[in-house]
Amino acid sequence: MKHTLPSALVTLWRDSPGYESARSRTFNQRVPPELPYAIVKPKNVEQIQQAVQLAIDLDKQIRIRSGGHSLAGWTLCADSILIDLVDFMHLEYDATTAIASASPSATSAQLNDLLVPHGRFVPVGHCGDVGLGGFFLQGGMGLNCRSYGWACEYLVGVDLITADGEYKHCSESENADLFWAARGAGPEFPAIVTRFFIRTRPAAAKHEKSTFIWPVACSDAVVSWILKILPELHADIEPLVVSTIVPGPNIAAILVQFLVFLGTNETGAEKLEPSLTAMPDGTIMEFKGVSTSIQQEYVSQEGTMPRDSRYICDSVWFKDGIDFVAVTRRMFREFPRDRSMVYWEPKYPTSRRKLPDMAFSLQADQYLALFAIFEDSQQDQEQGIRIQEFIQEIEPYVLGTFAADGVPAVRKTQYWSAEVIERLYSVCQKWDPAHRLGCTLLDPTRKMKS
């Protein structure tokens, strides 16, 4: 049964023109089959409240879409009210406080572009089109996270609509339990964010990138080298390691990229060169000291991970202290084929810091993700099985998974510390007792009984 709504509120029912294109507004072209009961596209806070009331009146669950970048397609839930924030946009910077404010639909690239003229920076996502809603709520594995910390640590306040339609502001001193949850609860956050308030930091004056590529047979030497230099690697350098098929020579290779954040009179060489003295021999390509910018990196990333592809991803936090070289050897050497890749982003030393009191609570020295990237829908099952075969092989060495990469329907794992899980159940029960929001990573039956 359809429901009478204000005419200004864009609402698409299953038989409405444009329903399917709105439903499939996702980065991943492997769109889940679930059909929302209705898709609502609010333009202001009042309309978000109207959408919540619609869900209450019809006794439906609610899903929120910010940028649509979730590779697992969490925003699509059968028979739910999907609130798509694509037309709800706010982006502003206050130079007197150095605080930015943004709606969940604003992207990493848009926030970065806003701050660049002011010489300010937030460790935004590695993909420019990632919406800030999912990014901040899941913790925010942003640029140079290993040194600059988790993006959610930069939040100083959040405006939101509760599950019963009330407007609230939360911070460390106001509705503190919701503010705690907003920093790491991910898709289990029991409210709808309308605005993030974000502390900024001085931006780098310039950036340089150095890239080194070896045949994949050199993976042991390359991985050992990265592990060795991490404790002394300059804090303004982000290292990334990727194992993939390199176009051109069309061979399986292991690639190391260093993104260097520089002051006006600094050079990449003075920050990076000390770490290159023990670099393994045998590179097939080297690109040193290439001038770049965050904007340019986003353009490059669009080529590596384009919107017109199908994606399957799973990731792990490895237990600290394992023989990382031996455990990951087969992944680095055998997983790459076609456009698929192994992605390793070391988190030391931020992984050793005591985290603030927030829901984000699971981290380790080493984060690694497997990406299958392809076009043919007939490969969906094969690609998914292949990823899980590699993941199952390393399961004894796994601490848990980054919430943004969770695939609970495929693999059960840990996304938060045990004590945070207990606390998160309590916060969800307090603010969403009817369980309208969330149902992805926590047990929905237990949430309702907490």
Swiss-Prot record:
Similarity field: Belongs to the oxygen-dependent FAD-linked oxidoreductase family.
Name of protein: FAD-linked oxidoreductase penO
EC number(s) from the headed UniProt entry: 1.1.1.-
Record PROSITE patterns: FAD_PCMH
Start and end residues of each FAD-binding PCMH-type domain: 32-203
GO molecular function terms listed in the Swiss-Prot or TrEMBL record: FAD binding; oxidoreductase activity
Pfam family, one: FAD_binding_4
Protein's job: FAD-linked oxidoreductase; part of the gene cluster that mediates the biosynthesis of the indole diterpenes penitrems. The geranylgeranyl diphosphate (GGPP) synthase penG catalyzes the first step in penitrem biosynthesis via conversion of farnesyl pyrophosphate and isopentyl pyrophosphate into geranylgeranyl pyrophosphate (GGPP). Condensation of indole-3-glycerol phosphate with GGPP by the prenyl transferase penC then forms 3-geranylgeranylindole (3-GGI).
